[in-house]
Amino acid sequence: MDQSGVLLWVKAEPFIVGALQEPPPSKLSLHYLKKVAAYVRTRATERAYPRLYWPTWRHIACGKLQLAKDLAWLYFEIFDNLSERTPEERLEWSEILSNCTTKDEVEKQRNQLSVDTLQFLLFLYIQQLNKISLRTSFIGEEWPSPRNRPKSPSPAERSSCHNKNWNDYNHQAFVCDHLSELLELLLDPEQLTESFHSTQSSLLSREAVTALSFLIEGTVSRTKKVYPLHELALWQPLHAANGFSKISKTFSLYKLEAWLRACLTTNPFGLSACLQSGKKLAWAHKVEGATKRAKIACNAHMAPRSHRIVVMSQVCNQTLAKSSETLVGAHVRAHRCNESFIYLLSPLRSMTIEKCRNSTFVLGPVETALHLHGCENLKVIAVCHRLSVSSTIGCTFHIMTPSRPLILSGNQTVTFAPFHTHYPMLEDHMARTGLATVPNYWDDPMVLGGEGTDTRVFQLLPPSEFYVFVTPFEMEGDTAEIPGGLPPAYQKALAHREQRIHNWQKTVKEARLTKEQRKQFQVLVENKFYEWLVSTGHRQQLDSLVPPPAASNQVAKKDLTWSHGALET
C-alpha cells in the first residue's frame, strides 16, 4: 500500500448496473475501441469530444463498428442512466418523450443527448467483464498472477459472489489486469505510437484521470469521506508518487500506473465486505423443518448512502415484506429464495434476483437496473428503468419501464404483462427515482442473447388471463390506484370479468333459494374457493401473512414491516 495512507478501490456500481450480463460484440474489443478513441479526438468540432452526442455515436457504432442501431442506443442509454441527474431532470426527459408521436420525433430528441466521451470509452471496455474466457472455463481458477491482483475469495464467499457483476474480487482483478489498456484508451493520440501503444514518456491529461474516476475512488488514512480518484491524484503530497506536473498539467503514465497498482485494494463497501462484516438483519423468520436459515445483511451502518448494499439468501416458504430506510437507494441482491412472497416496498437503486424459484417479488421503483438470472417460475412486479433476464424458465414480469426489456441468452417461456398493482407510497417513490408512467415499453422486448431475433422465447400475457394484484399491506401515502392505468385490452378484460360476476350474483339472488339451500350453496362455494386457493398457491401466501410470534420481536424500530397483513412502524 502507498505510504501516504491513500486507499483506492474499484467502484461497484459501474459493474453491477453498467456491464451487461452478456458477452460483448467482437467490435467492442480493445483494438476497435482504440480506433474509436483516436477518431473522436480528431472530431471535436463534430460533437464527438469531450462530449459524445448520440448522432456521432450512432454514426461510429453503426457505420464503423457495424453494430445494430438498437444495440448502439442500448449502450448509450445504459451509460446515460449511470450519469448524475436529478429525478426532476429524468422526469422532464420522460415528459419530452411522451409528447413525441412518431419515431422520428423521438430520434430528434435523442439527438440532443450527450455523454462524457472518455468515460463512455471506459464503460464500453468494461463490457469485456462477461467475455467468455476459454482459459477460465478449462482451469476454473486463475493462472499465477501479478502480486497486485486480489486474493481469490474463500469457498463460502465464492459461492455467494459467483456473479461477476457483483463480485468485487472480479472488479479489482479486471481493472488490475487491464489497467494498461484502460490508461491507453485515455491517452491523447500524440502520446501513442502508430500501433496505438503507449511509451515510457507518455503523458496523461487531467481530463483523462478525471474520466478514470468513473471506475476508481478512494480515501485518505481511513477517513470516512470517499473521494473520486482525480481529487486524490491532484493532492499535493501525492504528486511525486503519481507523476503529476504542475507545469504541464499532466501525469506521467508510467508513474501513475505504478501508483494506482500500489494503492488499489478491495472495495470496503463491496459484496465481500458486506458478507464478512455487514450488519445481520432479522427480517425473515425461522421456518420449521428448513435445512438452512435465511441470511440477510447490509452495510448501511458503515457505507455512505450511495454505496449501500443489501443481500438476502435462502428466504424460503414465507412472506417477507419491508419498507425500510435501509433499502432506500440500495443495490439489492436476492439469492436462492424459494417458495416465498417477497415485498421490498422502498425506492431501490438496483435489484438482482438470482437462482430463485417458485416465488413472487413485488418491488418498489428500481432507479437503474432490475436483472434476473437462473430463476424458475417467478412472478416479478416492478416499476424499473431497465429489465434484463438471462437463463430463466417460466418467469412472468408485470413491469412498467421507459426502456425495452432485454432478453439475454438462455431463457425459456418469458411472459410480459402490464404493471398491475399499487401501494400508498408508490407514486412518491417513483418521483424520488425519476420514473414516470410514460413512455412504457413493457410489451416491446429486445432479444439480445443466443436466441438472436427469435421472438418465440417470449409472449405477452393474454388479457383473458390477466388479474389485478392486490398488495395486502397498509401504510401511509396517497396512491390509491395503478399509476398510469391499464392498457385498453386488459382493462376491457377486467370489465368483462366483473360483468360476469355481477350477472352470476344477480342469478343467485333471483333464484329464491330456501335458507337450507343457501347454506348448502355457501358451503359448496367455500369448498371450491378453498380448492382454488390450494391449487394456485394463494393459500400459502395467506397463511404466511400472519407471522409467528417470534418474528414480531425481531423488528427494527425505525423499519416498516408486516404484521397480520398490515405494514406497521
Swiss-Prot record:
It is found in: Cytoplasm, Cytoskeleton, Microtubule organizing center, Centrosome; Cytoplasm, Cytoskeleton, Spindle pole. Signal peptide: none annotated. Pfam families: TBCC. The keyword Cytoplasm applies. GO terms for biological process: maintenance of centrosome location; maintenance of Golgi location; regulation of cell migration; regulation of cell shape. One of its GO terms (cellular component) is spindle pole centrosome. The keyword Cytoplasm applies. Residues 304-435 form the C-CAP/cofactor C-like domain. Keywords: Cytoplasm, Cytoskeleton. Belongs to the TBCC family. Plays a role in the regulation of centrosome and Golgi apparatus positioning, with consequences on cell shape and cell migration. This is TBCC domain-containing protein 1. It comes from Rattus norvegicus.
